[in-house]
UniProtKB/Swiss-Prot annotation:
Gene for this chain: cobC
Cross-referenced PANTHER family: ADENOSYLCOBALAMIN_ALPHA-RIBAZOLE PHOSPHATASE, BROAD-SPECIFICITY PHOSPHATASE YOR283W-RELATED
Function: Catalyzes the conversion of adenosylcobalamin 5'-phosphate to adenosylcobalamin (vitamin B12); involved in the assembly of the nucleotide loop of cobalamin. Also catalyzes the hydrolysis of the phospho group from alpha-ribazole 5'-phosphate to form alpha-ribazole.
GO BP of this protein: cobalamin biosynthetic process
Family statement: Belongs to the phosphoglycerate mutase family.
Pfam families in the cross-refs: His_Phos_1
An annotated GO cellular component: cytoplasm
Sections of the chain in a coiled coil: none
Alphabetic keyword roster: Cobalamin biosynthesis, Hydrolase
Molecular function, one GO term: alpha-ribazole phosphatase activity
Catalytic activity line of the entry: adenosylcob(III)alamin 5'-phosphate + H2O = adenosylcob(III)alamin + phosphate; alpha-ribazole 5'-phosphate + H2O = alpha-ribazole + phosphate
Protein name, as recorded: Adenosylcobalamin/alpha-ribazole phosphatase
Length: 202
């Protein structure tokens, strides 16, 4: 099985530097262009199904990438970005004085501290691992397109490669790029990370 990883295009919150876990934030014109470029780069990729986050920025990206295809799509909450709740659509500069104690604790120990009323890293990790455990349900597929978010995709790569969850920072998944992981008999290999090349059949 090959997993094709695509991060949603640039959003207004990305440009403003805001935390945007589940909060709605539309693609910018640049983000729309990134998704349309991926449509061209991946035109010949033989996707059997697409697994997508519930969030509109990911779904919009998926629609643009797959324009003209009738690829079956599954919307999965496990692929949603980490949920910041009270910190949604806020800048870290504001949190340093508006929610100083919680934000300082999170900066000091991000693996165990929890954003105010939000989803902590441990819960987020368990959610992404639930998604990994569900991949077996798609064993009839050779090529799965996964459209999601930076945090999810970085953590997905780390855990599939049997690395600790905290290793996600080693894998920055860029917007406007595609990546692939091959899984054979339960062993995952990162084949491509952040390609901007046209995919051609091997």
């Amino acid at each position: 099985m090959r997993l094709w990883l695509v991060r949603h295009g640039e959003t207004e919150a990305n440009v403003a530097g805001l935390y945007s876990g589940h909060a709605p934030t539309p693609l910018t014109e640049k983000g729309i262009g990134q998704a349309k470029t991926l449509h061209t780069l991946l035109r010949h990729a033989p996707f059997d199904r697409v697994l997508c986050s519930e969030l509109e920025r990911a779904r919009h990206t998926a629609r643009l990438v797959l324009e003209g295809r009738d690829t079956p799509q599954h919307i999965l909450p496990e692929l949603n970005e980490m949920y910041f709740v009270d910190w949604e659509m806020r800048h870290h500069r504001d949190l340093t004085h508006e929610d100083a104690e919680s934000y300082a604790a999170w900066c000091t120990d991000w693996q165990n501290a929890v954003p105010t009323n939000g989803e902590g890293f441990q819960a987020f990790t368990r959610r992404v691992e639930r998604f990994i455990s569900r991949l077996g349900a798609f064993s009839d597929c050779q090529n799965l397109l996964i459209v999601s978010h930076q945090g999810v995709l970085s953590l997905l790569i780390a855990r599939l490669l049997a690395m600790p969850a905290a290793s996600l920072w080693h894998f920055r998944v860029e917007q406007g790029c595609w990546s692939t992981i091959d899984i054979c008999e339960g062993f995952a290999t990162l084949k491509v990370l952040n390609s901007r090349a046209v995919w051609r059949p091997e």
